[in-house]
Amino acid sequence: MSKNVPNIRILMAVGLFGVMLGTVGLPIYLHAPKYFSDTYGVSLASLGAIMFALRVVDFVQDPLLGRLSTIGFLPRRLLSAGAGAIIIIGALGLFIVTAPINPTIWFALSLILLFTGYSLSVILLYTHAVNNFADKAQTIVARWREAGQL
């Protein structure tokens, strides 16, 4: 495939993808800790420590997800759909399903799913951009994704 600059239709799709990813962030960082604190009595300090620890896990897993996205044993569309499904399952676990186990552990498990799905989605987006668009288009794609997240 030739490396070119994406057309406006593709950029709008990237922006819409950014909107979807942006809607995940606010509930995770603002609403989830308060919800778990109010509903289950888990201290905000504990929830903050869990969130920090999971960001460290995310730091380690992101290169592995990047490798997964380039191996090619699964079609990227399937990986992308899987990432979206993981985000949905994590969000349902966080806000809809009553914690069937210790709420602190349930919070951590739900966030692991959300962070993994989010990271894989972003990695797949940028992998697609690198593989399909010219170098000068990378910042354009990033700009549209970030604008969508705002």
Please give the residue ranges for each predicted region:
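Membrane-embedded alpha-helical bundles of multi-pass transporters/translocases
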Residues: 1-150
